């Protein structure tokens, strides 16, 4: 059966295991520099007729492959409840001195922030059954806590602005539409991303090295050079090249982002995030 089918993959793949590579190569008895670390969990959703499973019986190889009429609900659930929290927890954790996703989840403050974003905000924007969403979100947290995968938050922060636009911004809009107020955690996450792109050093001396398109890097560099968080807020939210629209048109967003930026500058990330929990 020839055809082109929409697909979705779900697996956390931190990449090259720098810390463990020597031990791994010793175990396999040869030098392999193409090793990739990944979690055991995996899911491949294929939007295709059931008969395609007969042509491609991946399940018989022990693989978690689903052939479904529509991959959209799986895509929406995964992007919202896994990728969405990833995108905002990473700058909050890193600027609080935490480097690994697992450690962020265990931290009493950052862990509470992650739970707020995932269960109290993003989950409220989806239309799937509540018990199904609760189960998926709980499973995602368990995956984040995987003791065998050291998922660096800096690897997640590559191209943070485009990621926020696709993973979190829809949730901001839907939450506002349904609740009549902005989701504090998601908006704080945007302020954290903006702060991360300021660069510089953490309190422990670790370099803050954002990585995005040159256009976005130049924009944030120039905005932060003004030393004015209002100008930074105005400039980022009005950047249609990032968002495809002017986010200043979202009621209350400018004021809340500015407030969060000021809190982060004044108190530091960890103390600032406590104010919304």
Per-region residue spans from a language model:
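Substrate/ligand-engaging "lid" and interaction regions
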Residues: 1-277
